[in-house]
Swiss-Prot record:
Belongs to the fluoride channel Fluc/FEX (TC 1.A.43) family. The chain crosses the membrane at residues 1-21, 29-49, 55-75, 87-107. InterPro entries: FluC (IPR003691). The keyword Transport applies. Its main location: membrane. It comes from the Bacteria. It is a multi-pass membrane protein. Fluoride-specific ion channel. Important for reducing fluoride concentration in the cell, thus reducing its toxicity. GO terms for molecular function: fluoride channel activity; metal ion binding. It comes from Streptococcus pneumoniae (strain ATCC BAA-255 / R6). Signal peptide: none annotated. PANTHER family: FLUORIDE EXPORT PROTEIN 1-RELATED. This is Fluoride-specific ion channel FluC 1. GO terms for biological process: cellular detoxification of fluoride.
Length: 109
């Protein structure tokens, strides 16, 4: 039954990511994907420290956060930003450093 809940949670995470991706499409920086990825990292940190059940953790972290965050879209957006090095490196640093900080902040809560 965990697999069913995990799949449902993943679908919800993907829907949330979709709505974030619609945000600020005119910006050079893909803010929707950045917000989705940073939120997913933060939530994984929160779940890591506050969810005792391995099954519930799998549903929330792997399911919901897995659907919310996106490595493939991130890399697609990065390759599109290669022509503007400043934006490319800003997005790269914000995503990876921000994700690491977000996980630690979630754990500290």
């Amino acid at each position: 039954m965990v697999i069913v809940y995990l799949a449902i949670a993943c679908g919800f995470g993907a829907l949330v990511r979709y709505f974030f991706s619609r945000y600020n499409q005119a910006s050079k920086l893909p803010l929707g994907t950045l917000i989705a990825n940073l939120l997913g990292c933060f939530l994984i940190g929160v779940f890591y420290n506050h969810v005792e059940s391995k099954e519930v953790y799998a549903i929330l972290a792997t399911g919901f956060c897995g659907g919310l965050t996106t490595f493939s879209t991130l890399n697609d957006e990065l390759q599109r930003l290669l022509s503007d090095k400043k934006v490319f490196y800003s997005y790269l640093i914000l995503t990876y450093l921000g994700g690491l900080v977000a996980i630690f902040l979630g754990i500290l809560l």
